[in-house]
Amino acid sequence: SILNLCIISVDRYWAISRPFCYERKMTQRVALVMVGLAWTLSILISFIPVQLHWHRDKVGSRDGLDPPSNLANGTPWEEAGESDRSAENCDSSLNRTYAISSSLISFYIPVAIMIVTYTRIYRIAQVQIRRISSLERAAEHAQSCRSREACAPDSGLRASIKKETKVLKTLSVI
């Protein structure tokens, strides 16, 4: 589910942003709590409300909670042939509060968290690539100066851009 993907993104962010603290704090118990939280939220937002018919809009519904006695034109349900609830009829009237809270909790908030965490991971990766590239260029420059060649300006900018592009492609696939 998206909630599990959200937990994975948060876990990856913690592992990348604080690698030394991650080893101590991310125990098996914490991982189980995070996965349990995702499943609990999924059950609370979908299974229980559907089983208890909380997800249906009470106005004009035929779910047994608040059944209207007549149709809009005054015809009773039985006369209109609606009493048997055949599989051909699809009642899509949702309770507005349920629809909004369900979509927020099970989709929009997790997706927003995933976008934020993967954006931060990308920025951390960019900073690391720049640091590594500058160290590599400094080492190459020092080597070229030691061998008494002309100390040429760095040509590692292209390599740095290639590495950043590779990181962007990798994160976009994830």
UniProtKB/Swiss-Prot annotation:
One of the GO BP terms on file: adenylate cyclase-activating adrenergic receptor signaling pathway
Transmembrane segments: 1-10, 33-54, 97-119, 170-174
Gene Ontology molecular function: dopamine neurotransmitter receptor activity, coupled via Gs; G protein-coupled receptor activity
Spans annotated as Disordered: 64-88
Residue ranges that the UniProt entry lists as topological domain Extracellular: 55-96
Keywords in alphabetical order: Cell membrane, G-protein coupled receptor, Glycoprotein, Membrane, Receptor, Transducer, Transmembrane, Transmembrane helix
GO cellular component: plasma membrane; synapse
Subcellular location: Cell membrane
KW Nucleotidyltransferase (keyword) present: no
Residues with glycosylation annotation: 95
Record topology, Cytoplasmic segments: 11-32, 120-169
Cross-referenced Gene3D superfamilies: Rhodopsin 7-helix transmembrane proteins
Superkingdom in the source lineage: Eukaryota
Record-stated family: Belongs to the G-protein coupled receptor 1 family.
Function (record text): Dopamine receptor whose activity is mediated by G proteins which activate adenylyl cyclase.
Protein name: D(1B) dopamine receptor
Natural source organism: Bos taurus (Bovine)
Originating gene: DRD5
